[in-house]
A protein has these predicted regions:
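Conserved PLP-enzyme active-site core in the AAT-like
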Residues: 1-290, 296-305, 309-325, 329-349
Length: 349
């Protein structure tokens, strides 16, 4: 039986060139800033996203937390989208470690509105927390992999900067957004004061993310990384794979997007689920289960056929395409899911 891994693009495996680069990596001690491969990766990442410097961190969650801690002070409030990864999937780390309260704003598609952000910025009243940061997410995971375009990002950053707020961009999948929009990634990162992006999702590196911004910001973030236990020694072994990810795997993200669209189209008309084609902008497909089908039953039916999907939100299942999912895998998934749900519908009659 086929096995099709659609739970997340974090399941990507390193490429052969990554494994060779890791084995041959020139290394030093990165806490002393003397690992030449880490330094090359940091220079490359900063140049690619149009920032002065960047920092290699073990995970995107740590990168986001380093940014929050660097931009804010205890007692501040950060404006976030209600379903953003920073707010929903990072264990309240900003509050726990940094004393930073999150102010979530609801949106239909993950795209904050500038007027909405303007209203959320606190007045300078002694009773209020100080609004200290605006966080954006591009692509937006829980809203289906939707993209912020440059105009939208600039408008949001303008509102924040006018009020003296820095802007942090959680760009875990920012290269997916750039490829989907047909843009240089710097057009999407330019308005933000800092940006985090992952190497270990669609770009297929085994470990790591990058946090980029001005030199002074990155130096302060380096201290936060050390405090959080993220200072690594001979990290060039990992950074070597990151260099391969950025030089070899960006353009091929278009294949993942095409496969996601193929999957979404194939699931149109399948009973008991609804897929919004308009939300399939990058490499994610969200299927909404229609009663009496539950997401748990959908996941189980898929697993019986070797297809692994993610029980995401209430009544919702997420499917994510990536380098290790082929067009043949998509065809199999469409056929198997369709047959399973049609049989389920007949059994319920």
């Amino acid at each position: 039986m086929a096995t099709v891994e659609l739970r997340s693009d974090t399941f990507t495996l390193p490429t052969d060139s990554m494994r060779r680069a890791m084995a041959a990596a020139e290394v030093g001690d990165d806490v002393w800033e003397e690992d030449p491969t880490v330094n090359r990766l940091q220079d490359l990442a900063a140049e690619m996203v149009g920032k002065e410097a960047s920092l290699f961190v073990p995970s995107g969650s740590m990168g986001n937390l380093c940014a929050v801690l660097t931009h804010t002070r205890p007692g501040d409030e950060a404006i976030v989208e209600v379903d953003s990864h920073i707010y929903t999937h990072e264990v309240a780390s900003g509050a726990l470690v940094g004393g930073v309260q999150m102010r979530p704003l609801d949106t239909p598609d993950g795209r904050l509105d500038p007027a909405q952000v303007g209203v959320a910025i606190r007045e300078p009243d002694i009773h209020n927390p100080r609004t200290g940061l605006l966080c954006l997410e591009n692509t937006h995971n829980l809203k289906g992999g939707t993209c912020l375009n440059p105009r939208q990002t600039e408008a949001l950053a303008e509102v924040a900067h006018r009020a003296g707020l820095p802007v942090h961009l959680d760009g875990a999948r920012i290269f997916n957004a750039a490829v989907a929009l047909g843009l240089d990634v710097r057009e999407l990162t330019r308005p933000a004061d800092s940006v985090m992006f992952c190497l270990s999702k669609g770009l297929s590196a085994p470990v790591g993310s990058m946090l980029a911004g001005p030199h002074a910001f990155v130096e302060r973030a380096r201290r936060m990384r050390k405090m959080l236990g993220g200072g690594m020694r001979q990290a060039g072994v990992l950074a070597a794979a990151g260099i391969c990810a950025l030089t070899e795997n960006v353009d091929r993200l278009a294949d993942d997007h095409a496969n996601a669209l193929e999957l979404a189209r194939g699931l149109q008309g399948v009973p008991a689920i609804a897929v919004d084609l308009g939300r399939v902008e990058t490499n994610m497909v969200y299927a909404h289960c229609l009663p009496p089908l539950t997401r748990e039953r959908f996941v189980a039916l898929c697993l019986e056929r070797g297809i692994k999907v993610d029980a995401s939100g209430p009544g919702t299942v997420r499917m994510v395409t990536h380098r290790n999912v082929s067009r043949q895998d998509i065809a199999y998934a469409v056929k198997a899911i369709g047959e399973a749900l049609r049989a389920e519908a007949l059994a319920a009659v």
